[in-house]
Design a protein with these regions (language model features):
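N-terminal positively charged helical leader segments and presequences
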Residues: 1-44
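Short, intrinsically disordered, charge-balanced linker/junction segments flanking boundaries
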Residues: 3, 187-190
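Mobile, glycine- and charge-enriched loop segments
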Residues: 13, 38, 44-55, 162-170
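Residues in the short beta-alpha loop(s) of Rossmann-like NAD(P)-binding domains
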Residues: 19, 86, 148
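Short amphipathic alpha-helical segments
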Residues: 69, 94, 156-157, 185-188
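Active-site/ligand-binding-proximal alpha/beta "capping" segment
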Residues: 142-180, 185
């Protein structure tokens, strides 16, 4: 706050505390090592979506996944789950998972700050499609982005979803990697 934003005593900043509520705060003390703020005004409205959206996607090549994580955060996604699929090109080695998740969490935090979100999306990694299914059984709606669905001229599934009231509902959207989703995975998911 002091170095990057060049904020001084009595300047106002937005702070989101653990209660996920945004406050306008006064800086009452600052130095290089710490900043002390005092809540000044509670910001009542939230810019979070009323629908809890989870996106599940296999890891992509490094620069693509980082860009995608940033944009998903800016769009208002609530959870992001990375999973191994049959066709994903980018594989994460078991000993690298924690360091990658830590780096990607930092990207999510920065994107949430930049887009003035009240929360930082959660990021998790599951090792298989079956694990993904097991961890998302409680979702209200499940959507799979499948390239061959465009052959279905009516797209009834998507039309039905978009007609529903999605407020206070949860949706998981599953996407394939650069190689797409295999026929076997589609049969498991549908």
């Amino acid at each position: 706050i002091v170095r990057v934003m060049r904020k001084n005593i009595n300047d106002k900043v937005f702070i989101v505390f653990n209660d996920e509520i945004k406050y306008i705060c006064n800086i009452i003390d600052n130095n290089i090592n710490r900043v002390i703020v005092e809540p000044f005004e509670k910001v009542e409205e939230s810019n979070e979506l009323k629908t809890k959206i989870t996106v599940a996607i296999p890891p992509l090549k490094n620069d693509k996944i980082e860009y995608l994580l940033q944009k998903l955060t800016e769009l208002g996604v609530f959870n992001i789950i990375l999973f191994n699929s049959e066709r994903n090109i980018a594989k994460i080695k078991a000993d690298k998972i924690n360091s990658k998740l830590k780096r990607w969490d930092k990207i999510l935090k920065e994107a949430a700050e930049q887009s003035k979100r009240n929360i930082i999306p959660t990021l998790s990694y599951v090792n298989s499609l079956q694990e993904l299914i097991n961890t998302t059984t409680n979702m209200d709606y499940k959507v799979v982005a499948y390239e061959k669905e465009s052959h279905n001229k009516n797209n009834e599934n998507l039309k039905a979803l978009l007609k529903d009231d999605l407020n206070n509902k949860s949706i998981i959207a599953v996407f394939g990697s650069e190689g797409g989703i295999s026929e076997n995975e589609i049969s498991i998911l549908t």
